[in-house]
Amino acid sequence: LQIMIANYHTHTWRCRHADGTEREYVERAIEGGLKILGFSDHSPYPFPDGYDSGMRMRLDQVEGYVDTVLALKKEYDKDIEIHLGLETEYFPRFWDQLIDFLSDYPFEYFVLGQHSLGNEIEKILYSGHGTTDGSYLKQYVDQCLAGIDTGKYLYLAHPDLFLFNGDEA
């Protein structure tokens, strides 16, 4: 039996598709025997024209997220090691704006979780829908590699999310 001692990939209520507060995550992690808990809620993106994503926290929620995680890190420092991160896609068109915005906060790590080709508002394909088109798989890999090449990401999360169902040749 292997016991997981660390989890660096967690999402809270702020991303709008997960449940639970940060405190609930910490308490469950301690109960489950985790030694390290990394928060990596879905990062906001500074999309134009007031576009509001339904799958990530809003820009105005970042400060509350950071303050909450840092307070829990201090409160539970004898019980569990807590880290502050974000899961974010690599959208080249908006990347510099995002990094500039996030640089005001003490994030320890970013997880690359690429959910769309192109970007969320001009998406070519949402990765969870699957495809048999090999050119989309190549674009997905190229976009992930470009994100990794920024040097900002700790790791690539769920690369299988793309759901390529085409010829494996």
Where are these regions (language model features)?
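Domain-core and long-helix interface of multi-subunit machines
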Residues: 16, 104-107, 111-169
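Charged, low-complexity, helix-prone segments enriched in Lys/Glu/Asp/Gln
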Residues: 61-65, 69, 95-103, 136-141, ...
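An N-terminally biased module of ancient metal coordination in phosphate/nucleic-acid-related enzymes
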Residues: 1-92, 155, 162-169
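Short aromatic-enriched loop/helix-cap "lid" or pocket-rim segments at secondary-structure transitions
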Residues: 50, 97, 123-124
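Short amphipathic alpha-helices and their capping/turn segments at secondary-structure boundaries
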Residues: 21-35, 93-107, 139-152
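Short, hinge-like loop/turn segments at secondary-structure boundaries
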Residues: 55-57, 100, 128-129
